[in-house]
Amino acid sequence: MNTNIAAFSPDLPVHMTFEEHDWHLLAQYWYPIALARDITDQPTSSMLLDMPLVIYKMNDELVVAKDACPHRGVPLSLGKNDGQGVVCRYHGLRFGNEGKCNRIPAHPQHKISERFHLKTYAAVEKYGLIWCSLTADKDAEPNIPVMPYWNDADYQQLVCPQVDIKCFAGRQLEGFID
C-alpha cells in the first residue's frame, strides 16, 4: 500500500502550487483581492494564493468565500444574486449574509445543515480595495498597511488598475524583487 498519498484538506486550495508550509505562512497576511468599486451584490471571482474566491455584498455586508458551492463544487461566481443571496447555477442553493445557505430548492422544508454554509474569510474594504486574509480571525483587527494621508485632501489618492499576471505567485514575487 502506498503511504505517500497526501491527505486532503478542505482548507487548502485544490490546485495548490505552494508547499503546504509556505501556504500557511502566507495565508495569515492580508492581501488586496479586488477594487472596492467593482464589488456589488452580484458575485465576482478572485484568486488568492491559489484559492478561488467569490466576493459579493449582501445588505451592505461584504462576503468573501471559497468560490465553490458546498453541494457540488460549482463556482458561485457564475451565479446571480436574487436579492436574498447568491444562487448557484447548478441546483439553485442560495447563500446570503455571512455566506449562510438560506435555500435548498429540493428540500424547502428541511432545516439547513451547517455543512451547506460557505467557507468564508476575513475581509474588509479599505483604501478603495477589498482586503482578505485566508486564516485571520474575522473579529481581529486587520493587519493592513497604514496609509496616513489617504483621507487628506492635500494628497491625491490613486487606486491602480488590476493586472492579471498568468503565472504562479513565486514567479510574480521574483519579478517584483528585481
Q: Which ranges hold each PLM region?
A:
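Rieske [2Fe-2S] iron-sulfur-binding subdomain
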Residues: 1-62, 82, 96-178
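Local cysteine-cluster metal-coordination motifs and their immediate loop/turn environment
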Residues: 64-78, 83-96
